[in-house]
Each structure stands twice: as C-alpha cells, then as structure tokens.
Amino acid sequence: DLHLCDRRQRQMCIRDSHKAVGSFIRRYGEYIAEGADLPAYVETTFKNDEKGDPLVTKDALVALGVMTAEQYDAIKEETQKITQIVADDLKEKGMVLYDIKFEFGYAPDGSVMLIDEVASGNMRVYKDGQYIDPMTLSQLFFA
C-alpha cells in the first residue's frame, strides 16, 4: 500500500506487499487467500483513519496535485527495489518478507527520497509459517 501521510508536509508512507495480508486481505479477502503471493504489489491509499485510508489512483494523485506521474513512478520503483533487497537479506536467514512500509518525502529539487529507516517494526516477516514480532526479528536479523 502506498499511504500518503500529512499532505501539507508532502510525506508519503509506502507499503509494498509480497503476500496478501493486512489491509490488502481486509479489502480483498473474499477473492484471495491470506498469505497468497503478490508480485511486489504496491497499492496507494491516503493515510486518513477517519475515512478508513481510502484507495487513491495514480491519476487521482496527479489530478489532486499531490505528486506528478513521474514522482509516483519513482516512488513505486524505489519501493520495489528496496523491498527486494530487504526480502533477499531476510531470505538468506530463512525468513520471508510479507510486506513492508517506508516513508518518502521530497528533496528541495522535487525528487523523491526515502526519509525513514528500514526497521523491523515497519514490516511483517514470517519464519517457518510463523509471524515474527519486531523485537524478535531484530534479534534474529542481527544475530
């Protein structure tokens, strides 16, 4: 899911899902099994708890002036690249990345950049079919 956070600050939270879990399964659970593979699926929603984080398309983001089509494409591409690096590192340790969240913002020149750390609390990871809580994940990953 691509979550757009405080629009005034022009920060975005991005969720890239490799497995059908979380908000994706809440929306589409009657159409797909929980944990089913998703090919680096990136979904865009506005981060708005009162409205249930409504879905928003790339075209809507452009029309609303939230970002350009090029900025959206850059965020999506960067998200998928970073996610694959994290997934590969976890796989080396016998773990499976289900989904991960990043925060992106804009540099003064308008380019998109990652503005948050890659942390265990921002991802869902499983080992041998069991969810790994963030504290345990940190211990396993850095062991």
Predicted regions and their residues:
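Single conserved hydrophobic/aromatic residue that forms the stacking wall/gate
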Residues: 1-10, 14
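Short, His- and charge-rich active-site/binding loops that engage polyanionic ligands
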Residues: 11, 15-58
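Phosphate-binding core of ATP-grasp and ATP-grasp-like enzymes
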Residues: 35, 40-52, 83-96, 120-123
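Detector for glycine-centered tight turns/loop "hinges" at secondary-structure junctions
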Residues: 52, 94, 109-110, 129
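Conserved metal-phosphate-binding beta-hairpin within the catalytic cores
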Residues: 16, 97-117
